[in-house]
UniProtKB/Swiss-Prot annotation:
Segments traversing the membrane: 515-535
Annotated localization: Virion membrane; Host apical cell membrane
GO biological process terms on file: clathrin-dependent endocytosis of virus by host cell; fusion of virus membrane with host endosome membrane; fusion of virus membrane with host plasma membrane; virion attachment to host cell
Name this polypeptide is given: Hemagglutinin
Protein's organism: Influenza A virus (strain A/Duck/Hokkaido/5/1977 H3N8)
Glycosylation positions in this chain: 8, 22, 38, 165, 285, 483
Subunit structure: Homotrimer of disulfide-linked HA1-HA2.
Family of the protein in this entry: Belongs to the influenza viruses hemagglutinin family.
């Protein structure tokens, strides 16, 4: 007689989730390595190798530095009145005018870079009793000697150099940047030949500040045929303030002012070529996509960029826990549910059903539970990007030699920030991965409990993610369970009858075992009784003597 469980009167329904033979390892709060079918890389580790000129306005400095363009070096005249979002300085940039230094070079460079413009307004300074527009063979403009176009070199007129005292008020409603300088002759003879006085002095003042510079006469290494130097200084005049210039020699005077603007413009040293393309994020290595929350291409960035971290890779789980299917089982040789392993080949959903009934076997995804999980996971990457992407640029830090301790401190602070963000990135991704796996496990359990509530007493939980259904359940019946329209009352009587038959047969088939165990117990008892009787009989006849000593 066939068991009712083995004919067409029952069916098996299993619930499971998607799996693949080889998943991806991710990190969670509770596990350093846990396998998931799908994961998204969060660290951008390569650049395009070129700087995109859209949406940011890129100004290629070519063979000019920003300061040379600011001063008006003859070979940088093309940059007059230019504007930019990002000024790109090249490693092959050079100066081609009178040798100079800027005592506060980094601050001036940063100030002008952030202003984003070289817009220059000429003003009518009156320099009485001196010769203007001095030039040098070190600064050729065409075949003739020249000088920085934004500066005015003042020398003696005849045999006199009077004391100069010039004022220039700021009657506008914006800040004005004035660039001026002091000439340091190489010899005392050069000093008197140019300025008469043996020692000059330059004082530039506003209501808020004052700078007094005394020339330092002496020979220096020859540069472009000159052993003298010019020191470049700068002064910002606020609206309503007044610029006052006082000098008795060695003054490199301003010709006007640069209009200061506030903005998010910047400067970057890079040799990457500039190309016609679109990218929000720029590094010295080239533009990089900003569709990831982290990058380890370069610490220096401009635009909306991923946060720099030390890690080469951080993977965000976008799927559930991966438990590869046991290949020895066969597809339906003995189907099992999610408690034992996942299912391979289920490509149209994350969660689904497998069944075995009178019509054969089948598999289908549960789109509702799959969509519920995807809806919660979707946007996770965007949320991480929003939390981490820089909305400002990370500028280069430059310090002069005398600011070495400040530079060391700045480097320590930057390194500490990177360490903290690298740690934060690890924790953030681990938390998100933990949440994703817990979420997908929860959706699987919800689907299982929903199915269990539908079937009620018509089926039995087999403990492996499957149900044994105690009534005939064709494909239409299985579909009703999947879509939630199953009516357990329709199959209640059939299920109850089949359950009793199956349990009854299982009980009868187990009688042999009970009889064997009872027979064995009785045989052991009788053997013990016979052995005890023999010992007592032998003791009475004297064949066995038992001595008890106290």
């Amino acid at each position: 007689q066939d068991l009712p469980g083995n004919d067409n009167s029952t069916a098996t329904l299993c619930l499971g989730h998607y799996a693949m033979p080889n998943g991806t390892l991710v990190k969670t709060i509770t596990d350093d390595q846990i396998e998931v079918p799908n994961a998204t890389e969060l660290v951008q580790s390569s650049s395009t190798g070129k700087i995109c000129n859209n949406p940011h306005r890129i100004l290629d400095g070519r063979d000019c530095t920003l300061i040379d363009a600011l001063l008006g070096d003859p070979h940088c005249d093309v940059f007059q009145d230019e504007t930019w979002d990002l000024f790109v300085e090249r490693s092959n940039a050079f100066s081609n005018c009178y040798p100079y230094d800027v005592p506060d070079y980094a601050s001036l460079r940063s100030l002008v870079a952030s202003s984003g413009t070289l817009e220059f307004i000429t003003e009518g300074f009156t320099w009485t009793g001196v010769t203007q527009n001095g030039g040098s063979n070190a600064c050729k403009r065409g075949p003739a000697s020249g000088f920085f176009s934004r500066l005015n070199w003042l020398t003696k007129s005849g045999s006199t150099y009077p004391v100069l005292n010039v004022t220039m008020p700021n009657n506008d409603n914006f800040d004005k940047l004035y660039i001026w300088g002091v000439h340091h002759p190489s010899t005392d003879q050069e000093q008197t030949n140019l300025y008469v006085q043996a020692s000059g002095r330059v004082t530039v003042s506003t209501r808020r500040s004052q700078q007094t510079i005394i020339p330092n006469i002496g020979s220096r290494p020859w540069v472009r045929g000159q052993s003298g130097r010019i020191s470049i200084y700068w002064t910002i005049v606020k609206p309503g303030d007044v610029l006052v210039i006082n000098s008795n020699g060695n003054l490199i005077a301003p010709r006007g002012y640069f209009k200061m603007r506030t903005g998010k413009s910047s400067i970057m040293r890079s040799d990457a070529p500039i190309d016609t393309c679109i990218s929000e994020c720029i590094t010295p290595n080239g533009s990089i996509p900003n569709d990831k929350p982290f990058q380890n291409v370069n610490k220096i960035t401009y635009g909306a960029c991923p946060k720099y971290v030390k890690q080469n890779t951080l993977k965000l789980a976008t799927g559930m826990r991966n438990v590869p299917e046991k290949q020895t089982r066969g597809l339906f040789g003995a189907i099992a549910g999610f408690i034992e392993n996942g299912w391979e080949g289920m490509i149209d959903g994350w969660y689904g059903f497998r069944h075995q009934n009178s019509e054969g076997t089948g598999q289908a995804a549960d789109l509702k539970s799959t969509q519920a999980a995807i809806d919660q996971i979707n946007g996770k990457l965007n949320r991480v990007i929003e939390k981490t992407n820089e909305k400002f640029h990370q500028i280069e830090k430059e310090f002069s030699e005398v600011e070495g301790r400040i530079q060391d401190l700045e480097k320590y602070v930057e390194d500490t920030k990177i360490d903290l963000w690298s740690y934060n990135a690890d924790v953030l991704v681990a938390l998100e991965n933990q949440h994703t796996i817990d979420l997908t496990d929860s959706e699987m359990n919800k689907l299982f409990e929903k199915t269990k509530r539908q079937l009620r007493e018509n089926a039995e939980d087999m403990g492996n993610g499957c149900f044994k259904i105690y009534h005939k359940c064709d494909n239409a019946c299985v579909e009703s369970i999947r879509n939630g329209t199953y009516d357990h009352d329709v199959y209640r009587d059939e299920s109850l009858n089949n359950r009793f038959q199956i349990k009854g047969v299982e009980l009868k088939s187990g009688y042999k075992d009970w009889i064997l165990w009872i027979s064995f117990a009785i045989s052991c008892f009788l053997l013990c009784v016979v052995l005890l009787g023999f010992i007592m009989w032998a003791c009475q006849r004297g064949n066995i003597r038992c001595n008890i000593c106290i």
